[in-house]
From Swiss-Prot:
This is NAD(P)H-quinone oxidoreductase subunit K, chloroplastic. It is an enzyme of class 7 (translocase). Pfam families: Oxidored_q6 (PF01058). It comes from Angiopteris evecta. Binds 1 [4Fe-4S] cluster. GO terms for biological process: aerobic respiration; electron transport coupled proton transport; photosynthesis, light reaction.
């Protein structure tokens, strides 16, 4: 790689003929500070440091803190973060908020649609451990690391925008130290979609026999004429005036 400022100071000899509009000149001592020697792995990591495009994924109040990064006060564009709405164009997903059992398959589907290499930041206590819903909630996932691999954990309820920037900087350091084998390694191994919730199933009291079978009518101890004359409307029963009168006064 040759810097443009140093390349402009190189004197080109006019007596050397040009071949295909390009000149080949030998390297001298003046160009020793103009060349950066590196390998393909480090060059790829350097290029990806400023192109981490996050996927907009917010399910709770933590996303309000993440949205404040877009403003001019914090300005996360200086780190090369461009919010994307499609998982196929994103390199990073920041899970901000509570993840429920119903939302878990959608989160896994979004993660699988992201191209490799991809990264995950778990933002907030509800995302990491379930937060205040982890004790008595039957529908909250106790940590998204049961669903997808997490690279950076960001605790807080909710975390400050400065903490989000610090997590992004730590992720950039991790990206800079990666190798090709680390990027191509399957991160989905030993991952499972399960839960420790214990559901107790009880038999239903609604058998449906009152609709399909007439054998349930004698159990009500009601006359057949009274059952036929009843009209059900909005879970209320309406009867004739004769049935409301006491016996012997009809």
């Amino acid at each position: 790689m040759v810097l443009a400022s140093n390349h402009s100071n190189i004197e080109i000899k006019s007596d050397i003929p040009l071949i295909n509009s390009m000149e080949s000149y030998s390297l001298d001592k003046n160009m020793s500070n103009s060349i950066i020697s590196t390998n393909l792995n480090d060059f790829s990591n350097w290029a990806r440091l400023s192109s981490l495009w996050p996927l907009l994924y917010g399910t709770s109040c933590c996303f309000i803190e993440f949205a404040s990064l877009i403003g001019s006060r914090f300005d996360f564009d200086r780190y090369g973060l461009v919010p994307r709405s499609s998982p196929r164009q994103a390199d990073l997903i920041i899970t901000a908020g509570t993840v429920t059992m119903k939302m878990a398959p959608s989160l896994v589907r979004l993660y699988e649609q992201m191209p490799e290499p991809k990264y995950v930041i778990a933002m907030g206590a509800c995302t990491i451990t379930g937060g205040m819903f982890s004790t008595d909630s039957y529908s909250t996932v106790r940590g998204i690391d049961k669903l997808i691999p997490v690279d950076v954990y960001l605790p807080g309820c909710p975390p400050k925008p400065e903490a989000i920037i610090d997590a992004i900087i730590k992720l950039r350091k991790k990206v800079a130290q990666e190798t090709y084998r680390d990027r191509t390694k399957n991160k989905r191994e030993n991952r499972f979609f399960t839960s420790n919730h214990q559901f107790k199933f009880v038999p239903s009291i609604h058998t449906g026999q009152y609709i399909s079978d007439q054998s349930s009518i004698p159990l009500l101890d009601l006359p057949l004429e009274r059952t036929i004359s009843e009209m059900r409307f909005d879970n209320k029963f309406f009867m004739n005036e004769e049935e409301l009168l006491p016996k012997g006064r009809k």
